[in-house]
Amino acid sequence: MSTARWRLVSKASWIARSSQCMCVTTAGQLIVYGGELRPRQPVDSADSSQEGPAVPKPRVGATMVCMDDCLYVWGGRGGVDMAPLDDEQVGVWRAELKTGSDTAEPDGVIWERLSYTDGPEPRSYHAAAATDNDFFIHAGCPTSGRLAQLHKFNIRSRQWEELSSAPAPPRGGTGIVSKNLMSWGRVVLRFGGFSGYELPSVPGTLDLFDPKHDRWYTLQPSPDPIHGYPGARSVCGFAHFESKSPVLSSIVGVLFHGERDASTLGHAGAGTFWDDVWALKKTESNHVVQWAWRKLDVKPADEQGEGESGMPEGRGWFAHAGWQENGTTSVFMHGGLLSSNERSDELWELQIE
């Protein structure tokens, strides 16, 4: 059995939050944006009196991807009524990191609102994944109800394209990853979400989108021989994974934590959360792909670790991002909502061995 090891990287009370977004640049800089410390109150570290070019308003439930060392933010909700932001504010916002004159460390951000026509319906708690010159936006919560739509934005042409909608039910809080498969090419994988109940309703199932044929497929991976399937969940971690290690090379995605049961108070409260880690594995032979779930043995990076420095408490509504170095992916998890209804200030690194 492969092992998932958690390492506490930092604790910073000033950046405690949930419903934020995060990505890692090619230079290894981890960027956190948006979120809330208190329910329905977006956090903002900007000086509200500053003057200059337009910048995005504070928001929760947005997504952010890193492409060509620029950050691309779309979506979210904000304002007093916490409704989805309007067409102008929803984005796409591109952020370029400024560096100091005598250091390579970023000391500011230059924002630009990209112009386009016929963009997706504004929403929050959707999912995003980047690939080559495009990023995908999927599902989420508009002014009312939930969505199943999939859109693609090309950063070169600055054009949106609406693709085939995913299998029902519509959902918020789902997770998607983009992956290149030998027999398929580039695909998008989807797991979980919330549609009045935690998903998937059929244990272990996930959905695959084939961009070449603009078509969705529902997959039923084989279960873990001992633990079966990962439980239904939303607002969880679902991260792309790659490794040159022969033992780990079949792992394409990592699923972890997330909401197990929603709070009766809705967005104002905390439900119950998973604290597990699962590997989604695939093998290919003669152009036939086989999928399997495997539950990982979870341990602290320091075997003697105890308490808060050992392993993270179960949570949901956090930000996560993958980072590849030396041929292996590390997954980072920041903040999130705990069962105590408090927002975490922790940054954790997950490594699989």
Which stretches of residues belong to each language-model region?
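Kelch-like beta-propeller repeat domains
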Residues: 1-353
